[in-house]
Amino acid sequence: MASTTTWGGTDRGYDMSLWYDSRPLKIGWFAILFAVGAEVVFQRVFGYSHGLDSMTPEFENVWMNLWRFNVITNIINASAILGWLWTTRDRNLANLDPKTELKRYFYWMMWLACYVFGVYWAGSYTLEQDASWHQVIIRDTSFTASHIIAFYFTFPLYITMGVASYLYAMTRLPQFSKAVSFPLVGAIVGPMMILPNVGLNEWGHAFWFVDELFAAPLHWGFVTLGWCGLFGGTGGVAAQIVARMSNLCDVVWNNESKDCLHVIPY
């Protein structure tokens, strides 16, 4: 039974840091918030003053330089994160201790939380403001002040976090290293395929359906692929995590046989 400490807190009877450390999640969330916030502030300052006519030198200097910056920084960011995850992978997963595996699930859910946070900024915030931008501004290029932030910054950002989440599971969790999880693939690849769908969307707006109607067939792919991520993540992946963590808790705390860990709940 938990006891009260001299500071008015509760003594859980165990060291929380052995199981969960929220610092990586806080670092990831605040890094994403700062990066996207900086881009949004930049857009608010220079969007209408330098971002309406793509033929002007000001547009080239301000917005196309931001486009180049976004492309380069996303390549560096993806290379650094994915490279670190791969080089530090666990090469002896067959002998992974159940307690260590259980702790890794907490860290993996932090990766997934950062991925979902990135999906929000790309699929909700920047896309909604892109739709409102098209309602009042006539585009003369596909590299609009709205697209440069949405498609060339927030989209690669959440794709990197999604691939990183998949790579973490594949290289550190036995459940996902032994076989391919269809729900996890759907949760990652579905939203990822929104980016090539953007190319189809831009082509269609240029040569087929000029009006920016929200219910236009060109936009159906955004909804369908977004729902793939939602159903794959909230349904299948969540069920797999709960089932595996339940078995691990039985082994760690209830002294159950490790035989239950050989059953992979796909």
Go through each PLM region and give its residues.
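Hydrophobic cores of alpha-helical transmembrane segments in multi-pass inner/ER membrane proteins
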Residues: 2-4, 70-86, 152-165, 222-242
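Alpha-helical transmembrane segments and their helix-start/interface "positive-inside/aromatic belt" motifs
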Residues: 9-33, 98-113, 172-186, 240-243
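Alpha-helical transmembrane segments of multi-pass membrane proteins
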Residues: 31-49
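Juxtamembrane "helix-exit" motif on the non-cytosolic side of transmembrane helices
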Residues: 43-49, 122-138, 197-212
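Perimembrane loop-to-helix junctions flanking transmembrane segments
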Residues: 47-66
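Internal transmembrane alpha-helix with an interfacial aromatic "cap," most often the third helix
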Residues: 72-133, 165
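Membrane-proximal helix-loop-helix units in multi-pass membrane proteins
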Residues: 114-179
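C-terminal transmembrane-bundle signature of multipass membrane proteins
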Residues: 181-266
